[in-house]
């Protein structure tokens, strides 16, 4: 029998699908990545084509194995990690989606959320799902599809439609429609899953008018869900053995498996998660209570704060303002000036996430004078990522009663040394950047590998988490608080803008 030397992580993100092949020492052997189309039918609406998601993801799997000359019988397992909340509804007979995937960033269901609040559902949803009533989560997206796509409601009532977050859709496609599952971490992001009972909440489903028959079976983040024969020569069936939403996968990849350990992922958005173990901590500060992975992939509780615009605000500097030609140049230009010259950028392009939860906030630049140049704006945009992270971390420490000794970081933007140092300064906390920054893929691979015995256990995995660099805080306290106070004033200027703007029209 061929020795199984590899685990593959499929990392299905907001802008690209990736496949990452890891060996037994958790070294990256091969990577393949494909971008796919972002669809913006109206202002504030964001969609993806589910067929394109599957096509790009399956082709990266084939390509990553092919590039490294790896046969499928050398792969012990596949782990999946995915953009969360993004909603796919498809017909189980035809296998075709009834509508495009509605992406987590999409704000089209703001009015549905207002209507549900008016019906008094907010506190029930908060207490039982751990989430706030916001367009971000899957529940109102499913309701929108059933209410607005011709024939969808009738097909759903007849038991012909299935719902899935992206993980569910990929597993269903990869198993030729045999397996309809999700894991606890993804289920906890739908606003339809009761995190106290660990079951779909039938009261919420009834209130949203969503049939239970559409919902996938919910399983641990580390177990064999099914087999796939996609990906490489040999045609061997590979177990799909790990699933976790991208942020929970990163938390696991950083080995934050004990209560009180936390990480921040700097991707399209920023996501700060703190593992709270078996204790469900309810936030009084606008954070979410969600499910994460315990040591063996079983459900554990976590606090989460989501910032909608992290790396996406750097893309805005590049693509819309044309101030930089490459995202990596932002560090060079930001360090050409000593300060932001009193400028604050609040990148609330799609509203504000935690701890504000203001769907009507909009992007704002304040403090402009004639002396401000493009470098100041670039610097202020980078600084906004660090300020938003502090907003969330302050709330998290207040809720949990735990003062973090260090923050573990990952995601594309952690390569930016200016941002990491500024982050340490703003937080007055050490920031630890790991050697392997692909921790989301690492988490999915670890979960899959553990399920099939590729790795023995947690101790073996914890030995692989090496730190590349620690950033220590430099700012004095007075300067830190003065700058942060300025940020808070800038946020006030951005809030509720769309409401006032609409009234004026």
From Swiss-Prot:
Inhibited by fructose 1,6-bisphosphate (FBP). Its EC number is 2.7.1.30. Pathway: Polyol metabolism; glycerol degradation via glycerol kinase pathway; sn-glycerol 3-phosphate from glycerol: step 1/1. ATP binds at residues 14-16, 268, 311, 315, 412. ADP binds at residues 14, 18, 268, 311, 412, 416. Sn-glycerol 3-phosphate binds at residues 14, 84-85, 136, 246. GO terms for molecular function: ATP binding; glycerol kinase activity. It catalyses: glycerol + ATP = sn-glycerol 3-phosphate + ADP + H(+). GO terms for cellular component: cytosol. InterPro entries: ATPase_NBD (IPR043129), Carb_kinase_FGGY (IPR000577), Carb_kinase_FGGY_CS (IPR018483), FGGY_C (IPR018485), FGGY_N (IPR018484), Glycerol_kin (IPR005999). It is an enzyme of class 2 (transferase). Pfam families: FGGY_C, FGGY_N. The keyword Magnesium does not apply. Glycerol binds at residues 84-85, 136, 246-247. One of its GO terms (biological process) is glycerol catabolic process. Keywords: ATP-binding, Glycerol metabolism, Kinase, Nucleotide-binding, Transferase. PANTHER family: GLYCEROL KINASE, SUGAR KINASE. Key enzyme in the regulation of glycerol uptake and metabolism. Catalyzes the phosphorylation of glycerol to yield sn-glycerol 3-phosphate. Belongs to the FGGY kinase family. This is Glycerol kinase. It comes from Vibrio cholerae serotype O1 (strain M66-2).
């Amino acid at each position: 029998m061929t020795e199984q030397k590899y685990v593959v992580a499929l990392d299905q993100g907001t802008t690209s699908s990736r496949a990452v092949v890891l060996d037994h020492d958790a070294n990256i052997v091969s990577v393949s990545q494909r971008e796919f189309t972002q669809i913006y039918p109206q202002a504030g609406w964001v969609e993806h084509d589910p067929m394109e998601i599957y096509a790009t993801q399956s082709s990266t799997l084939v390509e990553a194995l092919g590039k490294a000359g790896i046969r499928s019988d050398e792969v012990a397992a596949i782990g999946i990690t995915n953009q969360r909340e993004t909603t796919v509804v498809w017909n189980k007979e035809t296998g075709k989606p009834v509508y495009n995937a509605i992406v987590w960033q999409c704000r089209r269901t703001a009015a549905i959320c207002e209507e549900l609040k008016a019906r008094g559902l907010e506190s029930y949803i908060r207490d039982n799902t751990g989430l706030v009533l916001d367009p971000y989560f899957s529940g109102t997206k499913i309701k929108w599809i059933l209410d607005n796509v011709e024939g969808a409601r009738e097909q759903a009532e007849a038991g012909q439609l299935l719902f899935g977050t992206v993980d569910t859709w990929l597993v269903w496609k990869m198993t030729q429609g045999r397996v309809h599952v999700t894991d606890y971490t993804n289920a906890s992001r739908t606003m339809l899953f009761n995190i106290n009972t660990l079951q779909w909440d039938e009261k919420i489903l009834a209130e949203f008018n969503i049939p239970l028959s559409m919902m996938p079976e919910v399983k641990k983040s580390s177990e064999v869900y099914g087999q796939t024969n996609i990906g490489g020569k040999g045609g061997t069936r590979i177990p799909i053995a790990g699933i976790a939403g991208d942020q929970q996968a990163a938390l696991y990849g950083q080995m934050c498996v004990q209560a009180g350990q936390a990480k921040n992922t700097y991707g399209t958005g920023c996501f700060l998660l703190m593992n709270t173990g078996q204790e469900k901590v309810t936030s009084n500060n606008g954070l979410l209570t969600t499910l994460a992975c315990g040591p063996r992939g079983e459900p554990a509780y976590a606090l989460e704060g989501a910032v909608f615009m992290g790396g996406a605000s750097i893309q805005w500097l590049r693509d819309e303002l044309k101030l930089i030609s490459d995202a990596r140049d932002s560090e060079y230009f930001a360090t050409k000036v000593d300060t932001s010259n009193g400028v604050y950028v609040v990148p609330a392009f799609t509203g504000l996430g935690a701890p504000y939860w203001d769907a009507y906030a909009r992007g704002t630049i304040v403090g402009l004078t004639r002396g401000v140049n493009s470098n100041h704006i670039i610097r202020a945009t980078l600084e906004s990522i660090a300020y938003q992270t502090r907003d969330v971390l302050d709330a998290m420490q207040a809720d949990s009663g735990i003062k973090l000794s260090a923050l573990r970081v990952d995601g594309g933007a952690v390569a930016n040394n200016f941002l990491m140092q500024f982050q340490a300064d703003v937080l007055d906390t050490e920031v630890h950047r790991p050697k392997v920054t692909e921790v989301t893929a690492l988490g999915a691979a670890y979960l899959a590998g553990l399920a099939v015995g590729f790795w023995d256990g947690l101790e073996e995995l914890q030995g692989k988490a090496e730190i590349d660099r620690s950033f220590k805080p430099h700012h004095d306290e007075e300067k830190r608080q003065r700058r942060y106070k300025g940020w808070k004033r800038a946020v006030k200027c951005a809030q509720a803008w769309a409401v006032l703007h609409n009234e004026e029209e």
